[in-house]
Amino acid sequence: LDFREKKRGVDMAELGVEKGLAKAEKYYNDYGKRANELKAEGKKIIGYISALGPVEVLTAAGAVPFRLKGNVDEAITKGDAYMETIVCPFVRNVFDSSIKGKFSFLDGMVLPHQCDSLDRTSDVWRDYLKLSYFHFLNVPHVTDDPSIEFMKELLQLLIKTLEDYTGNKISNDTLKQAISLHNENRRLMRELYGLRKNNPPLISGTEMMKVLVAVMGIPVNESSELIKAVIEEVKARKPAADNDKKRIMLIGDQIDSVSITDAIEGAGAYLVMDDISIGSKMYWQDVDEDKEPLLALSERYLRKLKIPTTFVDTGGTYEENLNARFGHMRKYIDEFKVNGTILFVYKYCDPYGFEVPAIKSYIESAGVPVLYLEDEYSTSSLARMKTRIEAFLEMIA
């Protein structure tokens, strides 16, 4: 398989005709439209739901990795008939969208062993979506050498099931090619993030959110072309004069809506960086192309990716342990000149709930104030959140 060739029916020059940000907004507003078109062209669309989605393997199989998302503006009307209301509201909302047929173009899904809300509902996803392909990836939660070996075996099993399903052989060469494509995609996204270091940033947090969501639902080659177009467009902007607006970093998990970014920037701040699942967590760590592919992938997803469900044991002091888990956040704070952070966690998200005290104290110990927000995956209480954000910005002014 040559992933660099132009896909059938896709004129990549089209991205040059329609500016990158306009294209991203179109994909954001009509999420899944491009995947639906590719499905009609005969492509296999394989869904995933978190930063643990092994996108390189899906690409190597000739499939289109498609990240599932919910709709914060839509109430859960069917999902609660299948899942308890104490299940993470994000998971319930995504399942609700799925059971309503929002992602009817999906051929299959890879669901990771990550949190209780995913682990304990995997049978529900399998039994009620009735996809022709479903794979539960039993990702370990520790990062020692035996876990890396176990992860390699899990990826080998995933490859076998994908080969059987798609009919495409996933060789080391095709896997390396897919890894290279996704690494280049990550590099481009980091370049775009870098344009937020300016004061004021050249791209807003809301524009960035639309780009992040847009690229989750298209093939990696199209994603890279879109990011290039956005970079070119944003670089052409004339930098505005410096001002004293506060520079905010958003921390959280499955945040994929402009409602929160609009609330932050509408209150008079710049959203300049994030540590969220669809954002920097997806793009900051590459797969080592000099190592054997399965080993490199295992190390990337277990050791390099910093998520609450992975236990990092340094064997050192408490401070060393905190640095191993959250040190990247301090680097972001320094690099992007962050004045304040907003830690936004969904109700019933136990992994992040347990991490909140440690994250909050770690960041505050660096002299950066933290606003902790806990809410549903919904815009129903947005007014209350806006009030708290405004008060926080006044406090740190």
Q: What is the role of each PLM region?
A:
Residues 8-44, 152, 156, 160-286, ...:
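A charged, amphipathic alpha-helical module
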Residues 13-14, 357-397:
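Peripheral docking tails and interdomain loops at the edges
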Residues 25-39, 45-56, 75-80, 87-92, ...:
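Metallocofactor- and cofactor-centric catalytic cores in central/energy metabolism, strongly enriched
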Residues 51-52, 57-69, 252-329:
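Redox- and metal-dependent alpha/beta enzyme cores, enriched for Fe-S-associated oxidoreductases
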Residues 74-83, 144-148, 280-287, 381-384:
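Short, charged, surface-exposed secondary-structure boundary motifs
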Residues 93-164:
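Acidic/His-rich segments in extracytoplasmic proteins that coordinate ligands and/or metal ions
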Residues 98, 320-337, 354-355:
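A short, acidic, amphipathic alpha-helical segment used as a generic capping/interface helix at domain edges
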